[in-house]
Regions:
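Short, conserved sequence motifs used for protein processing/export or organelle targeting and
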Residues: 1-254
């Protein structure tokens, strides 16, 4: 369980920021037997084989377009994680307008384009499962406030969450409860403990990919050089992630 004590949605600010859970099953020596939400050295979420999971690579080598780009591949909001190729990511994802003459964007627009990090290209919201703060008002009360300001119900609805299913945590606010189901036959050793950590990324890998592949010019070249020469080893942001909370190893009962 995660409790949000920051007083607003988390992460907040620009929409490409994200937080994610790393959940590990450990043996008696502290070695990882199974993990969801592990990363590589550039901050991409990977599976047990070290392969980036769905939604981590928005662009391919030499800025080629991946086969799953048109389908807006991403990690959905989970209430139960059952595989190392799944990860709980708290984030907002938006998409571009579809490639046709007549397009309706904004409130209730259906995602049809590709995922984007450009504020100028936003047409529809794909996902918003950012953690709600304690005391987040339910929709009827948000509508009352919107009307008092002279705004419509759209404002109240758009300030909620998107694509979280029937998760009760997003009706009450305050955090998220999540279950990890680990098949015993997926473990190569004897499990002794589990550990959960919450990480934050202000600059996820896909944001940099999108900048480098969709923008040209000296500013982009400068950013590419800076990020390519940035040495985070041994820093609090090693592997392009910042630790927010850590449960420490929790022993598994008999």
């Amino acid at each position: 369980a995660i409790v949000n004590r920051v007083g607003h949605k988390f992460p907040s600010g620009v929409g490409f920021r994200r937080a994610f859970i790393t959940f590990e099953v450990l043996d008696g020596d502290g070695e990882v037997l199974w993990a969801s939400g592990r990363t590589d050295n550039v901050g991409r979420l990977v599976d047990g084989a070290g392969t980036p999971i769905a939604g981590e690579d928005w662009w391919g080598p030499s800025c080629s377009v991946p086969a799953d780009r048109a389908t807006r591949a991403h990690q959905p909001h989970f209430q139960s994680v059952t595989a190392e190729s799944q990860a709980q990511i708290y984030q907002e994802l938006v998409s571009t307008p579809p490639d046709r003459a007549e397009v309706t964007c904004g409130h209730d627009a259906k995602p049809e384009g590709i995922l984007t990090t450009s504020f100028l290209s936003i047409c529809a919201e794909v996902k918003d499962n950012r953690l709600l703060p304690v005391g987040y008002l339910p929709l009827p009360e948000r509508k009352e406030i919107a009307r008092a300001f002279g705004a419509g119900d759209d404002l109240a609805e758009d300030s909620g969450s998107t694509a979280v299913g029937e998760d009760p945590d997003y009706r009450t606010g305050g955090g998220d409860n999540l279950t990890y189901v680990v098949p015993r036959d997926a473990l190569t050793g004897t499990p002794a403990s589990v550990r959960a950590r919450l990480y934050y990324q202000a600059t996820p890998p896909f944001f940099l990919q999108d900048r480098f592949c969709s923008a040209r010019g000296p500013d982009t070249d400068r950013l590419h050089w800076l990020t390519g020469h940035l040495d985070l080893e041994g820093s609090p942001a090693e592997d392009w992630k910042l630790l927010v909370a850590d449960s420490g190893p929790v022993k598994i009962g008999n």
